Every structure is written in structure tokens, then in C-alpha cells.
Amino acid sequence: MLNEYTSFRKVFIMVSPQIKDGMVPAISFALPFLFAPIIVFSSLYGGFSIIIAPLFGYVFITICDFLIKISLSNPDPNSKKNLVYHKAVLWLWPLIQFFLIFWCIYVISNHQHLSVGESVFLMMAQGMITGAVGITFAHELMHQKSSKEKWLSDILMGMALYGHFRTEHLLVHHRYVGTDKDAVTAKYDESFFSFFLRVLPSCFKSAWEEELSRLRKINLPGSSLRNPFWRYGILAAIFLILSFAIGGSFGVLLFFTQAFIAILHLEMANYIEHYGLTRKLMSNGKYEPTKPHHSWNANHTASNLLLINLQLHSDHHAKP
């Protein structure tokens, strides 16, 4: 088992890519926008068209990763290039995702051309997009300093009914990654099923406790309006009410379906990113600093365009 683990590490942990020109044009990161016409087409025509989005996301991108040369270049972290166009890709996505989710609920609820199976599968395909693209974009936005970008992040996470992820990720995961205090560092030999059942309550609990602790330091109660859990809850409620207004109880069920698939994608990524990796506890009682070898990386070109370089995870923890 250990030999298999070592081999896996050699294949997938490619740390310290070379710093070259490296900056990928902003238009390249607009690849996920192709999902929009695919989902609209699938919702209108049904049948085998329902599987186009999963085929594109899971199969076509994977084939491209095998055919396209792995990229070992990296942008200069001290580059002064204007990233406004890169950010514009992120800013546009919440509107596109909002449209896609509620378009699907509207079409399914108000037209009869899709069977129940096609309807559920369409929402699962949308859930793949909400998770793989929406949450990935939300992750990038929540790390920005602008309050407006954090709002966009919260809106995207609200569409997955997983708003507390921002608190858990920023205040818990980045501080405790690779330790027992971080729920989303998967233990060596832990199955994904066990991991998933463990992190669902653990992440919510740790995020809530972290916000309570933060508020206590400024002498405010947990019920304070400065607790972002108010925002997380209100956004989730708005999306659920809108789902009900468009499609009734079935509309709410459809919304829950895509949200669950989105959460599943997020936690699959969390499971892989630090699986079996730990930081040493030093003699001073503190954990060693987070280093490149505390994250799994993948330098595959196509999937990194789709996931806006999420798989270069060592870079992310070095400079979040």
C-alpha cells in the first residue's frame, strides 16, 4: 500500500513549476462559459443531449489533458500585470450560473417534454457545473480583498447551500491544513465516503465556532448582524423561495439536487488536495509552516483552464 502511495505521489505532486511568462490570457479561463449553451440546448431537446455537459466536463477535458503537454510554467508572483480581464471572468459567472439553475427549474416545471429521469439528470449536470465551476470561482473570489467580490462568492456558495464554506476555508482550513484541527485534510487510508460523512457536520461546526470566537473578541454575541451566517442563511433562503415560486415543491427538490451534487464535487476536491499529508508538530508546540509538499498538485493544461488553476494547490497555500 505504501509503495502505491509513493507512486501516486510521484505522479501527481509536481511542485515548484518553472516561472516563465506564465500568464494565461483571460479568455482561456472563459472555457467554463461553454457550459451555458450546452445546458440550454439539453434543457430544450432532452434525450441524449442531457449527457453532453457531463461528457464535456468529465470525458472531453480529461482526453485533452492526456493529449496536451503538461504545463510546468508559472506566472511571476511579482508581476504587475493588470488582471481586470481575468477578474471579469469571475464577476460574470454568478449571473450565468443563476440563469442556468433557474432556467432549468423553469423549463422542467413548466414544460412537459422532459421525463422525470431526464429532469433529475439535467439538474445533476447543472450540479456538476455549480460545483466544479461555481464553487471554484467562489473560492477564488472569497480570497479577494474587495467586499463586493466576497459578496459574489457568497452568492455562488448560496446556490450550493454551502455558504459556511467561506468561513471554514479562510479561517480554519488555511490555518490548520495538514493537522487534526482541519476537518478537510483527508486521513491516509480514509475512504471518500467516510470523509464525506465526517466533513459535512464538522465543517459547519468549525465555521460556526470560529465566527463565535471572532465576535467574542470584539464583545459581540453570536446573534450579531456582523456574523456572516446571517448572510449565508438569507441567501440560501432566497434561492429556495425562488425555486418554490418557479417550480413549487418539485422546484425545491430540483434545486436541492444540483446543490448536493455541487457539494459532492467540492468535497471530492478537498479529499484529494491534501490526502494523507500532515504537518509536523514542532518542539515549540506549533505546527511547521505549510510547504509545497503539503498539497497534491496536477499540472494538466485543460482541466486547469476549466478550474482556473485550482489544481496548482501548493501555489494557493503559499500565497492565498
Language-model-detected regions and their locations in the chain:
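Short, Lys/Arg-rich, polar N-terminal cytosolic tail immediately upstream
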Residues: 7-20
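Transmembrane alpha-helical segments that form the membrane-embedded catalytic/substrate-channel core
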Residues: 59-68, 126-142, 163-166, 199-207, ...
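All-alpha helical catalytic cores of prenyl diphosphate-utilizing isoprenoid enzymes
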Residues: 197-240
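Intramembrane catalytic core of multi-pass membrane enzymes that act on lipidic substrates
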Residues: 76, 81-200
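Alpha-helical bilayer-embedded segments of polytopic membrane proteins, i.e.
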Residues: 20-68, 84-109, 117-131, 224-268
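Membrane-proximal soluble regions of multi-pass membrane proteins
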Residues: 148-215, 278-320
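Membrane-helix interface/capping segments
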Residues: 67-82, 278
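A beta-strand-loop signature enriched in Asp, Gly, Thr, and Trp
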Residues: 248-295
